A protein has these predicted regions:
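Repeated loop/turn-to-beta-strand initiation elements of outer-membrane beta-barrel proteins
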Residues: 54-63, 85-93, 122-130
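Transmembrane beta-strands of outer-membrane beta-barrel pores
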Residues: 37-43, 51-55, 67-73, 82-84, ...
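Residues that define the transmembrane beta-barrel architecture of outer-membrane proteins
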Residues: 27-31, 41-47, 71-76, 89, ...
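Polar/charged side chains located within well-ordered beta-strands of beta-rich proteins
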Residues: 31, 59-63, 74, 80-82, ...
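Cleavable N-terminal export/targeting peptides
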Residues: 1-26
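N-terminal targeting leaders of membrane proteins
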Residues: 17-40, 53
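Outer membrane beta-barrel transmembrane domains
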Residues: 64-69, 81-83, 89-117
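Predominantly the C-terminal beta-signal and adjacent terminal strand-loop region
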Residues: 22-29, 115-156
Length: 156
């Protein structure tokens, strides 16, 4: 008798457990704004704005797309970001296109560069970036075919 009561109870409880494991509706990607101030080579001071598209419900990672306007150039970048912890720390790896203006640091004026950049935020959105870019526009007679972009950043 006990076995049959146990089996009946088990058949009643099991569907409830299975219902709790049923896949729910897929959430759409979560988007949030991204803004920051950068200082460094070649654009000097610049203001960046863009969007973060969080693709995972369990981790804070996804796609980042940014546009940056600076004193001596403009940049567009897109790539992958990953936030770590709760204090605004994380990193991003991006493909970047940069167009310099009149007097950039360590770069040719009025020249287009393309390459990769890595951004690392230590805490509270404060961090650094490094990148390697190569000239894609018409060659001029100077030594700036390759460009190392370096700088510090404060972002939200």
């Amino acid at each position: 008798m006990r076995r049959s009561v146990f089996l009946v109870g088990l058949f009643i409880v099991l569907p409830m457990c299975a219902r709790g494991q049923r896949a729910g509706e897929e959430k759409t990607p979560n988007t949030s704004p991204a803004v920051g101030v950068h200082y460094g080579s070649p654009m000097r001071i610049s203001l960046a704005g863009g969007v973060l598209v969080d693709m995972s419900a369990h981790r804070n990672d996804g796609v980042v797309a940014m546009a940056e306007a600076g004193q001596q150039g403009n940049e567009l970048s897109v790539g992958y970001f990953r936030m770590l912890g709760r204090f605004g720390s994380g990193y991003s790896l991006r493909a970047a296109a940069l167009r310099t203006a009149g007097e950039p640091w360590n770069a040719s004026p009025n020249t287009t560069y393309a390459g990769i950049e890595a951004h690392w935020m230590i805490a509270f959105g404060v961090g650094a970036r490094v990148g390697y870019l190569r000239r894609t526009s018409k060659r001029v007679d100077d030594a700036h075919d390759n460009l190392a972009s370096i700088g510090i950043l404060v972002g939200l």
